Amino acid sequence: MSTTGKGGKAKGKTASSKQVSRSARAGLQFPVGRISRFLKNGRYSERIGTGAPVYLAAVLEYLAAEVLELAGNAAKDNKKTRIVPRHILLAIRNDEELNKLMANTTIADGGVLPNINPMLLPSKTKKTSEAEH
């Protein structure tokens, strides 16, 4: 006879034991199982260690949180409540380390950083400043 039946409990398991995802065990929001599957199917290596997808998920989650925080600040500076690609671009390009990481990346609808050569700006001379007073 089977150890499990209608209304029966599985052998060796208690009623309170549930499956806990690897993301939950690691305290992450990013899907460790999906990243593990991508690493295996991507044929990056013959074998993938058990800690590799957890570590990669943690790194990706940290980078996403960092970019979102800076983009949120950029949106707030522009008095907007919604993050758009322009805010993401401003966040990345104004952060030295993220700019280095994403140096060759183009963000669609991001535009460019505002930059005017100081030589092209009108210079303030003593005559104009005295005339204002």
From Swiss-Prot:
N6-acetyllysine sites (modified residues): K6, K9, K11, K13, K18
Cross-link entry Glycyl lysine isopeptide (Lys-Gly) (interchain with G-Cter in ubiquitin), positions: K124
N-acetylserine: modified positions: S2
Gene3D superfamilies: Histone, subunit A
Claim: Manganese is one of the keywords in the record: no
Keyword Metal-binding set for record: no
GO CC annotation: nucleosome; nucleus
GO molecular function: DNA binding; protein heterodimerization activity; structural constituent of chromatin
Localization terms from the record: Nucleus; Chromosome
Principal place of residence: nucleus
Modified how: Monoubiquitination of Lys-124 gives a specific tag for epigenetic transcriptional repression.
Residues bearing the modification Phosphoserine: S123, S129
Bilayer-spanning residue ranges: none
Gene that encodes it: HTA2
Alphabetic keyword roster: Acetylation, Chromosome, DNA-binding, Isopeptide bond, Nucleosome core, Nucleus, Phosphoprotein, Ubl conjugation
Domain of life from the UniProt record: Eukaryota
Subunit structure: The nucleosome is a histone octamer containing two molecules each of H2A, H2B, H3 and H4 assembled in one H3-H4 heterotetramer and two H2A-H2B heterodimers. The octamer wraps approximately 147 bp of DNA.
Protein's name according to its UniProt entry: Histone H2A.1
